[in-house]
C-alpha cells in the first residue's frame, strides 16, 4: 500500500485531468497506449474530443476513493509512538488540502481535536498551502462539535489575521460552535448578535443555512417569540425557507412536546407551498406518538401511505416503541406485521424496539425470544441489543436474570461496552445489590473499561438518592449542613454521609474504581512527563506535545474534587 501511494506509477494522467477546474469546457488530447511485448513496437492512438460529463464524474469519484484510501492509511499509522506530523512528513509529496479536509473529519469523529490543530500547523508550513475560508470553517466546525468554543474563536481571529475575509459559511460554523456550549441562554444571545452582525456585512449576508441553525436552536429552547421573529425576518429577506427549515423547527418543537407550536409551523409550511418529505412525516409520527396522541399519529401514517413518499424503517420503529410505552401490544405487533408485508427488512434497531416494546408491556418471555432469535441468526449482535434486553429485565424487577445474561453475554457473541456497565451499575445500586456492584467493578477493571467523568457524577447522584431524607425539599439543607459538619480532607465529606457499613462498602468500590482510573491516566503520561516540563513547550501550549498531558492533569484534579 505504501509503495502504491508513493511510487511514480500512482501519478496517473487521470489525476492530472481531475485537477483541471470544472468550469472549463476545453477539448483535451487523450492518449490510448497499448503496451505489448518488449520486442514489439509501442502503438499510440491519438484522438481528440470533448470529455463527457459522465467520465468527469467517474474520474472525480475515483480521485475521492484514492483520497480516502490514503487518509485511512494515515489514520491507521497514528499511534503514541509515532507522532502524526512525522507520518505526514513521510507522505509530504502526496498529501494535499483535500486529504487534510478528510483528516479533519476522521480526527473529529475520534475525539482527537488536538491532532486537527497539528495537521493545520503542518499545512501552514507547506508550499501549496493558501489561506482559505473553507479550511478555517471546517476547523471551527470540528472544534464546536467537541465543545472547544475558545479554540473556535481563536481560529476565527487567526483567519482574519491571515488575510481571509469571513463569509456566511464561516459565521455559520461559528454560530454552531457557540450552540454546543452548556450555557444555552448565553449562547442564544451570542448567536443573535452574530446574525445582526452578518446583516451589516455585504459579503456575509445570512443564507438559508443560517436561519435553519438559528430557528432550530431557538425552537429547542422553547422560545416561540424568537422563532416567530426569525420567520418574519426570513419572509422579509430575499432568502426563501426550504423543507429543512420547517423540519428542523417541527422536530425541535415535537421533542419538547409542544404540539400546538409544531402544528403552527406545519400550517406555515403549507402556506409557503413547501411539500413535506419523509422526514416531515417521521417527525409528525414520532411527536404525536410521544404525546400518546395516537389518533393523529395514525392519520399521519395514512396520509403518508397515500402520498408519493414511502415509509422508512424509522417510521415503523417510532410507532412500535410509542405503542409499547402505552402498553398497546396488539397495535405494535400490527405495525411489525405491516412492515414485513411491505417487504421491509427489520434492522437491529427494529428488533431492539420490539424487545423494549415487550418489556414495557411486561411480556419478558417474548422479549427474550426475540433476543435469542437475533443471537442465533447470522446477524452480529450489538451491545445496544444486549443493553435493551438487560433494561427489560431490570424494568420488570428481574435483576438476577439480568446478571446471568450479563455474565453469559459471550455465548451470544456480544461484548458489553461502557454503556452496559453504566446501566447495570445504576440498576444494581438502586436495587441495593452491593455484592453485584463489587463484582461489576472488578469485571469492569478486568475488561479495561475506563470510566469517564459522567460515570462518577452519576454514581454520586445514585448514592445521594439512596440517602435518608434525600428528597428535593431537603437537598439545600443537606448541602448547607455538609459544609459545617463534615471534616476536612479528601473523601471526608462523603464518608460522613454514608454512616452505615453497607453504604461505606459500596462507596469504597467506587473509590477503588476512581483510583484505578487515575493510575491508568498517570501511566499514560509517564513517558512524556519530562518533556512537559521544558520551558520552550510552556510558551506554546496550543500545538505542543504536552497539551494532552495538561488535559489529563486537569481531569485528575477534577475527579479529585468530585470524589
UniProtKB/Swiss-Prot annotation:
Q: Which GO terms describe its cellular component?
A: chloroplast
Keywords, A to Z, come to: Chloroplast, Plastid, Repeat, Transit peptide
What are the start and end residues of each PPR repeat? 132-166, 167-197, 207-241, 242-276, 277-311, 312-346, 347-381, 382-416, 417-451
Molecular function (Gene Ontology), one example: mRNA binding
Where along the chain is the transit peptide annotated?
Answer: 1-47
Q: Is Cell membrane a UniProt keyword of this protein?
A: no
Task: Read off the InterPro entries from this record.
Answer: Pentatricopeptide_rpt, PPR5-like, TPR-like_helical_dom_sf
Which stretches does UniProt call biased (Basic and acidic residues)?
Answer: 520-537
Q: Which family does it belong to?
A: Belongs to the PPR family. P subfamily.
Q: What does this protein do?
A: Essential for embryo development.
Q: What is this protein called?
A: Pentatricopeptide repeat-containing protein At4g39620, chloroplastic
Q: Which organism is it from?
A: Arabidopsis thaliana
| Gene, per the UniProt record | EMB2453
